[in-house]
Amino acid sequence: MANVLQTEQIAPASRIRAATLGAALTVLVLAGGLIASFMVSSATFQALDGRVPGSLTFTLAVLVFSASTLFSSALWGLGMAHLAQVPASWRMAWAGILGFVPITLLLIFGLQAAEPIVFRTNLPLHRVFTVLFVPSAALIAGTSSLALGWALGWGRAAPALALRVGLTAALAFLAVNLGMEALGWQVGGPGAAERATMLTVLFVSNLGAALAGGAMLGMTLAQRH
């Protein structure tokens, strides 16, 4: 078991293919699965609301969301196993689930709790957004990569993988965030509510983070020996 993150040189075409597949898997399966889970869960809640007791409606919506998210996370782990050229296994599926779902839920609740504290710092709203969500992108990407590294038996090389992918995702999120801000999409700025600026910037920045982080992860998995 190696203790450092060593990679082998592969052809540029293979490197591009691995990066593209890693980005596609992360955007379509992992991030896309989370969005689809929210949509299906919301549709379930709306379809059942008023027809069955409220507590049952909420429970069923949560179950639908959970099942969909768990499935997409497991599928992502299996896809990354293919990129790493190892047999698809329950171990990799569980790595996909445990690396993504707990940290995502923790950050959702943690950000809600931290929001009033951060607002008391009197920072502009667009800076509060950046301070909260750039580290969140790093944590989600890093934790997901760490779980995959451990499942692959990389030992102490797994944290190096997590750091590489986490920083890549965070920098991509920050670049997109600041780029949109320069183009007039400033969170909390003039007309922000009418254009749903916060949701739009969050979605596009997360998309950038998923693309960059997934590409880095896919390329590293393909090169690792």
Report the location of each language-model feature.
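Juxtamembrane/disordered regions of integral membrane proteins
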Residues: 2-225
